Design a protein with these regions (language model features):
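Positively charged n-region of N-terminal signal peptides that target proteins for export
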Residues: 1-5
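Bacterial N-terminal signal peptides
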Residues: 6-16
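Boundary at the C-terminal end of the N-terminal hydrophobic targeting segment
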Residues: 16-22
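Intrinsic disorder/low-complexity detector
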Residues: 23-57, 63, 145-214, 245-248, ...
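Intrinsic, low-complexity N-terminal interaction/targeting segments
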Residues: 57-76, 108-113, 208-237
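Extended intrinsically disordered, low-complexity coil regions enriched in Ser, Thr, Gly, Ala
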Residues: 63-66, 90-116, 220-223, 268-293
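Structural motif
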Residues: 73-84, 232-239, 251-261, 324-325
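Hydrophobic, ordered structural segments
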Residues: 91-108, 119-174, 280, 298-326
Length: 327
């Protein structure tokens, strides 16, 4: 399925866009939405974790940071501002939220499920809109408040950029390993390189090393145009009554278990091979986007549950395949 995520909102607005403003004045957006965001190079991003949800897979609790956070990106154009985003919601919230989005001038470009046998069932709506930043923020606030889909906070997020090391290289010398009260990530980081710990989640971001645009508008990595992986440790060991494979019967010692979710950005020519590698490593593809971008790109939304080291090894092979088009 080919989907235009960006071009539909810039028709008649021109394909040029403004450079990063010296003073974007995003404070008004934060005030309207009741939550701090993060200024980006040429725009602004604000997140709303669904902390009101208790999502589980086979009884295992999952963190909002793993895959259940609504994210919105504001990008100034020559005239007005482009807003793109992802709204995380429950099945039963979809009708009301969709109606609110349309009533407030947003377009829903796509809807897909998490599809990991999670309870309750989760969906993601991809949206776009245009207008002034203040009007967009006010419209978005009406949508989020109607469900309600947001919690206000005064905590200011830290600006951090975490990039995956090359899948063919060992972690750089001198890099600090991620540590967390929930346990270390040494096994995963030995394979994928140092990551950033956000609570119980280990985050990796890997921008595509080529400019990506649609209808003349460059889409930066911070607007979601990158590979993103999040790992979360889960309680229990293989062989218990939570649906894991019974390694004890095979004489193998218990392994550390993790849930993983994220998105892979790649060229269409690599998609089939990557999907085969994912399937071989018990990672599901929840949804596939075929973008009408230049160059043509595909986004695979993925999720898996299993031994953390095996998952990391599988994603290392996937990253090797993806990076063939970046050399």
């Amino acid at each position: 399925m080919k989907i235009t995520l960006w071009g539909i909102v810039i028709v008649g607005w021109g394909c040029a866009y403004s450079a990063a403003l010296a003073d974007p004045a995003w404070r008004s957006v934060e005030k309207i939405l009741g939550r701090p965001g993060t200024e980006q190079a040429g725009g602004f991003r604000i997140d709303f974790p669904r902390t009101d949800l208790n999502v589980t897979i086979e009884g295992i609790p999952l963190e909002p940071a793993l895959a259940f956070t609504s994210r919105f990106y504001f990008k100034p154009l020559v005239k007005g501002t482009l807003l793109a985003g992802e709204v995380v919601l429950l099945d039963q919230e979809e009708r009301q939220v969709t109606a609110q989005l349309k009533a407030n001038g947003f377009q829903v470009s796509q809807v897909h499920g998490f599809q990991m046998d999670e309870s309750p069932r989760i969906k993601t709506l991809h949206i776009v809109g245009r207008g002034s930043r203040v009007n967009l923020a006010m419209a978005l606030n009406r949508v989020l408040s109607a469900a309600p889909l947001k919690e206000e906070t005064s905590e200011k997020p830290q600006k951090t950029t975490v990039v995956l090391t090359s899948a063919t290289e060992a972690p750089a010398a001198g890099k600090t390993k991620a540590s967390s009260p929930e346990g270390d990530w040494e096994r995963v980081e030995a394979i994928l390189g140092p990551g950033k710990v956000e609570g119980k989640v280990l985050l990796y971001e890997d921008p595509f090393e080529r400019n990506i645009s649609e209808k003349g508008l460059e889409i930066p990595a911070w607007m979601g145009m990158e590979t993103i992986l999040r790992f979360q440790k889960v309680p229990g060991v293989l062989g218990q009554k939570n649906g894991f494979w019974n390694f004890f019967k095979m004489g193998k010692k218990p392994e550390k278990i993790a849930a993983v979710a994220g998105q892979l950005l790649l060229t269409p020519v690599r998609a089939e091979a990557v999907e085969e590698t994912l399937a071989a490593n018990q990672v599901k593809v929840a949804f596939r986007y075929d973008l009408e971008s230049s160059p043509r790109m595909v986004i695979l939304y993925v999720g898996g549950l299993g031994p953390e080291e095996a998952l990391a090894e599988g994603f290392k092979r996937v990253l090797d395949q993806i990076r063939l088009d970046q050399k």
